[in-house]
Amino acid sequence: MVESKRSALLWEVLHEAYTRLGLGEAVGGDRAFEQMVLARLIEPSSKAQVPRVLGDLGLESVSVRTLFRSLARAQERGYREAICQALFEHVTASGGLALCLYDVTTLYFEAEREDDLRKVGYSKERRVDPQVIVGLLVDRHGFPLQVGCWEGNKAETATIVPIVEAFQSAHGIEELVIVADAGMLSAANLAALDDARLRFIVGARTTRAPGDLEAHFHWEGDAFTDGQVIDTITPRRGSRSERDKSRKAEPVWDPHTHPGSWRAIWVYSKKRAARDNQTLTAQANRARAVIAGEKRPKGTRFVTVHAGDATLDEASIARARSLVGLKGYVTNIPARLMDAGEVVSSYHELWHVEQSFRMSKHDLRARPVFHHTRDAIEAHLTVVMAALAVARYLQDATGISIARIVRELRSLQEVTINLNGHHLAAAPRLTDAANDILTALSTPPPAH
């Protein structure tokens, strides 16, 4: 007679990753916290559902009350700081940390009222629910290092300096390259990062191209070749350039000879130009439809209204067409330390942090819709960050997603049979996929 079934192998793999990262030690062996973290990887749900999630696997859970007491401890005892230290030690165990990626997202709440933290602000999902801004700092492979939380109506540009300074202070870091998208590009941010002796690489807004490339347009017109790189300078503030457009050669940026500028790198791609042209054509067609009264004029580009009459802004369309295919980058790293190609490739590592956000918002469903106080929200994000670290560790080690790891191992159950009062445990027969996962993790298969 079958007495019980347990997905012991799945839990062992998750627990081993959690332990290898030093998370158990970081939280003082808090079993309830570990159960909340690992349960998120199996099935994203509320804390109150953790006993059910573990029960479905044939595993024993602590009580719901114990889980919520653990959340309170997470804030009282500084679990996040200890976890961040463990993750930093994991990342730097095999070498130094030279580059970090930063991005932000919004997490919304299905709530009727705002409070001090949960504010209605700009939402990437175009929602009007109260929300918080979450910033995530990861290494160049997308492994999480630090998470921050701000009021929902705070400008994204105001989040990067506090989280980077906190990270520097916590780990005694003096030299670091920070990579962020154009949303972080404010003059104050770049000056603050530079003052902190940090290097940065950020995306440039295309609207800067006419000024940065004024000499190129003067000498070459708007002709570019596929893969062309223009390494030049851009004003730190305003639009007044230190560039002498009467000289054809681009200046080599140096902080001493160009104190009012940063280094700017512009790259032209035929593939990007085709994509940009397609987008512009669609926008111009929409503008024409709005002018003709066929579509509603909500936020339409290339439409100008004068004395109540809507007209097509042909000059803006022509200006936009002259910039298709261009992508810009701003940095304070001199060419002697990093060539243009390396700056560009470093920036394009940003997809790792975007992937981490997708994991935390979709695979892990990080939205803390059930939490109502700042401490509870912060504790929830600590759980999410720990879960994301375990997920990234397993994904990097095996080359497959956490969702697939859970799917492959969940059905492999250890069965306990009661044979005339004698209890016999039977290990599951491993699939090829399960064997591959265990081999990649150097985890021995269960004994038969």
Predicted regions and their residues:
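Anion-binding and metal-coordination hotspots
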Residues: M1-S4, A8-H448
